[in-house]
């Protein structure tokens, strides 16, 4: 066989159909017509002389041959992208793309600052930030879809041997209260006082929720006795709920700097209890590491990796920047997303 029986465009179409589950949605995602997608698949099947999809059901299902081609096709597309990016790097950071992955908290509150600093130094390098769950982010690194990532959760066990995993920083979780709550007048909250609070939490399967339960359990605090007022799916929603007086919550200190400065949330330590988790920097050591990724990891990341990076936020509470609404009005706030 002198010529390849497929093109890169056909591999992209095959991958899109597998991801989207239908020819129409695949066509929409690729900004082409559905007939064009169908024609390319027909040509591909004719060239290979084998069906790639089982068209009997409502969802486009890959045949065994389709799965095999997709497996190799994804590797081919990934290598093509690596090749293009390696050539771009020859321009000495005068172009190219840096793709950074992050779990929810780090992607929302930490990475934007880092990327801002990087863009100031290398304005010609495009930066993409992909924020997903810890598991999905780790797989994105393993598959070569992102250059590096900072995550705060548990890395899937099946990936620990294939990734370069570096302890990056400690993320401290703090108890936040509405500024008009009686406990805000206390220097510290006793363990037994936690059972008197109503809590706003992430769902029970979230990484942060599990860390909180584990640490408090080691401090002989039974979170099963907590009064859960509601479960929400984002840190921003939790902060807004606490600010509105609906309950208390545990959140990363990196997520509350703005609110502490503005005096719309209160942070009080728990006597004898510190809740911390490790943030991990992960690479794929078997993938080409771009000059942009090297510059980001060597020049930007160290500035945020100091052991006490959370303490700068906690000092805001110690400086009495939080104002009780009984004494002063709360300033207007806006959602920073």
Swiss-Prot record:
Keywords: DNA-binding, Transcription, Transcription regulation
Pfam family name, one: HTH_1
Cystine pairs: none
Molecular function GO labels: DNA-binding transcription factor activity; transcription cis-regulatory region binding
Signal peptide limits: none
CDD domains named in the record: PBP2_CysL_like (cd08420)
Feature: DNA-binding region: 23-42
Functional summary from the UniProt entry: Trans-acting transcriptional regulator of RuBisCO genes (rbcL and rbcS) expression.
Family stated for the protein in its record: Belongs to the LysR transcriptional regulatory family.
Name of the protein in its database record: Probable RuBisCO transcriptional regulator
Naturally occurring in which organism (per UniProt): Nostoc sp. (strain PCC 7120 / SAG 25.82 / UTEX 2576)
Organismal lineage: Bacteria, Bacillati, Cyanobacteriota, Cyanophyceae, Nostocales
Gene name for this UniProt entry: rbcR
């Amino acid at each position: 066989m002198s010529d390849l029986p497929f093109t890169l465009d056909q591999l992209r179409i095959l991958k899109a159909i597998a991801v989207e589950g239908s020819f129409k949605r695949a066509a929409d995602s690729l900004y082409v017509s559905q007939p064009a997608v169908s024609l390319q698949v027909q040509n591909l099947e004719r060239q290979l002389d084998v069906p790639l999809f089982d068209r009997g059901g409502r969802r486009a299902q890959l045949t065994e041959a389709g799965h095999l081609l997709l497996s190799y096709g994804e590797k081919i597309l990934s290598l093509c992208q690596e090749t293009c990016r390696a050539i771009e790097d020859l321009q000495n950071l005068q172009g190219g793309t840096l793709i950074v992955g992050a779990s929810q908290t780090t992607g929302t509150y930490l990475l934007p600052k880092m990327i801002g600093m990087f863009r100031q130094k290398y304005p010609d390098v495009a930066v993409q930030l992909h924020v997903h769950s810890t598991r999905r982010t780790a797989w994105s690194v393993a598959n070569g879809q992102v250059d590096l990532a900072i995550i705060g959760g548990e890395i899937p066990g099946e990936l620990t041997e294939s990734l370069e995993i570096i302890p990056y920083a400690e993320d401290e979780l703090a108890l936040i209260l509405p500024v008009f709550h009686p406990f805000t007048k206390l220097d510290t909250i006793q363990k037994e006082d936690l059972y008197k609070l109503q809590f706003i939490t992430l769902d029970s399967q979230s990484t942060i929720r599990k860390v909180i339960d584990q640490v408090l359990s080691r401090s002989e605090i039974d979170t099963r006795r907590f009064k859960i007022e509601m479960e929400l799916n984002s840190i921003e929603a939790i902060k807004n709920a606490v600010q509105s007086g609906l309950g208390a919550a545990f959140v990363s200190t990196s997520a509350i700097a703005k609110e502490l400065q503005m005096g719309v949330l209160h942070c009080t330590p728990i006597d004898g209890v510190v809740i911390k988790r490790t943030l991990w920097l992960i690479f794929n050591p078997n993938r080409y590491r771009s000059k942009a990724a090297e510059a980001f990891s060597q020049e930007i990341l160290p500035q945020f990796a100091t052991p006490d990076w959370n303490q700068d936020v906690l000092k805001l509470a110690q400086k009495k920047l939080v104002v009780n609404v009984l004494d002063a009005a709360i300033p207007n706030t806006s959602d920073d997303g």
